[in-house]
Amino acid sequence: MPDCFSKSEVTDFMNFMKLPDGTSVVSDDMMEYLMAYGFFTAPASTKYHGNYEGGLLNHSRMVTEYLLALTQANHLIWRKARSPFIVGMFHDLCKIDQYRHPVTGHIEEFNGDCTPIYDEQAWEYNPDTLLKGHGDKSVMLLSQFYTLTDEEIMCIRYHMGAFTDKSEWNDYTRAVCQYPNVLWTHQADMLASHVAGV
């Protein structure tokens, strides 16, 4: 699903994704990928937070804003300055191809072809997605563009916290013990999705 994203929106996104020294966190290749695969128009969910076109971007930006605020307020130390930007903005990168508009009917053309009619107000899971998963998938997709630190990998992998599968709760706890920013990432995600509702 290619994105229709205005020049001013691209500029705003790129400016937001800059470190205090002006270094861009997002390469041109990464930006092309985000545009081509629908990051800016995808929803964040089918029926919960951010379940509208552009919801993934809004949710991801809010998580990043919360994570940056938590970092400053709590004097969090990250291995790399870019980490809260990458973790916050791309923790749900897995969702770029995870949802689609459901087909509600078809229009038969004169030549016998059928054109689907989509419900543009609703979302459903896309069964055609080849790469499944959540945190793991986001890490795999990001690895095409970044050499991620162990801390970034764990923060993205376990950002769901206790909402992850019960069989992984011990792993989540161990990840938090080794990389405390995993817990802060989960908190930023919960603030965005459950408090702000984005």
Where are these regions (language model features)?
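All-alpha helical catalytic cores of prenyl diphosphate-utilizing isoprenoid enzymes
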Residues: 29-36, 49-61
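Non-catalytic interface/linker regions that flank or bridge core catalytic/transmembrane domains
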Residues: 1-42
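Helix-hairpin-helix/helix-loop-helix acidic hairpins
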Residues: 64-65
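Divalent metal-dependent catalytic cores for phosphoryl transfer on phosphate-bearing substrates
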Residues: 45-47, 52, 58, 70-198
